[in-house]
Amino acid sequence: SLDEKFAYPNTGIIAVKIDARQFSAPPVLSVKIRGKRVQVPTNYDAATRTYTGLWDGTFQMAWTDNPAWIFRDIVLNERFGVKRYVNSIAIDPWYLYTVSQYCDELVPNGSGGTEPRFTCNVFLQNPGSVYQVLNSLASCFRGLIYYSEGELYLTQDREQEVVQQFSEANVIQDVAEDGGVSSPCFSYTGSARAARKTVVLANWDDPTQVYSSVTEYQQDDELLDKF
């Protein structure tokens, strides 16, 4: 540890000296930062996104863009996270472990290659409520949060094993006096053809363009042919 007192603790600073005669106006400086390290499982190689053997529940420090461990850092960090204000806060690391594995699974990238299902490269600069910030981060991996009895619970929208199947055989329905069904077990609704979307324009921050906001056009050819 250093005993020296820093003027800007926990801050990254860059200074650039340029010749003003070379520019008609002050140039715009863009910096691509790697960000801070966070705790990740000891059996996890963040660089290769691989997991080795069984995890014993311990952590190591590493840089990662896996949103599960970035989410955990925001919750448990005592300097700027939720734990600074709610000391008793806790979160299930074992469920986060399954979330992180799902995030790291490779999926098609639309250009003939693959990429991790979910990544997170975020620069938090605006204040917000705890619930708002955590929900925004959880949305990076299709997650939802709720708080109960000092513990933060997290669930992820992903394919899972069937818990219960429902059909007319095991659902109560209203039967009229004549024996006919007065109210069916299930009701089905649809949408108008004009309301069905076949094209989307998505705005996102493109890392190949210094994270500038770009608009991506995507269409569903199958739905276009159908509707």
Question: How should these model regions be labeled?
Answer:
Residues S1-F141, S148, V200, V210-S212:
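Polar, S/T/G-rich
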Residues G150-Y153:
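Hydrophobic residues embedded in beta-strands of well-ordered beta-sheets
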